[in-house]
A protein has these predicted regions:
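Solvent-exposed, well-ordered amphipathic alpha-helical segments
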Residues: 15-29, 46-55, 97-99
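Short amphipathic alpha-helices and their capping/turn segments at secondary-structure boundaries
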Residues: 34-52
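Catalytic cores of nucleophile-dependent amide-cleaving enzymes
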Residues: 53-57, 62-135
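Active-site-proximal C-terminal subdomain of hydrolase catalytic domains
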Residues: 98-181
Length: 181
């Protein structure tokens, strides 16, 4: 039973950040909601493959993260989305884990603990802004299973000063493309 990585990117509406992330990620799975993500992950594992890493990329903050159009925090994970998320149990291989790729989601320790309790594998996220055009994850990592641990270094402090002019240029070009069509 091969171990696979699954990279889910919110695609419920057009968003420049998600679009760039999807463009730079080969084989990403576009997701519209928690239910959509679960169904697509189950389909990817239907042949017997098991998950090494399930990475979910969506906008986030210190309280939670979007899974497509669904806002997932500790409360919604434990109540509203629990029946759907529980369907991921058993799809992970040995050492499998879940990564949330939204900005500052590593601060949401309660959410990470809730995901561990529901899905049954460690859940991790990073404690800084995340940028799809830079490889790797930014900031310290919080990984929660039966307990939470923080490791790693601080995020690049210079990233915003480098990215802000690039973002502005990118948005102008993108707006120009939109205006043409």
């Amino acid at each position: 039973m091969p171990l696979i990585d699954i990279y889910c990117v919110a695609d419920h509406e057009f968003d420049e950040t998600m679009w760039v992330d999807g463009l730079l990620t080969q084989g990403e799975v576009g997701i519209a909601s928690v239910a959509d993500m679960v169904a697509k992950v189950q389909a990817r594992c239907a042949g017997g493959d098991r998950i090494r890493e399930l990475r979910v990329f969506g906008h986030g903050d210190e309280w939670g993260q979007y899974f497509g159009a669904d806002w997932v925090n500790e409360q919604t994970a434990m109540h509203r989305f629990r029946p759907q998320l529980e369907q991921l149990r058993g799809l992970f291989g040995p050492g499998g884990f879940m990564t949330l790729g939204g900005c500052d989601v590593g601060e949401a320790a309660a959410l990470l603990r809730a995901l561990f309790a529901i899905v049954g594998v460690p859940a991790q996220a990073f404690m800084a802004k995340q940028y799809p055009v830079f490889p790797g994850d930014e900031g310290r990592r919080r990984r929660c299973s039966d307990r939470c641990e923080v490791s790693g270094s601080q995020a690049w402090e210079h990233v915003d000063t480098v990215l802000d002019p690039l973002r502005e240029r990118f948005h102008r070009k993108l707006q120009g493309l939109r205006d043409r069509f």
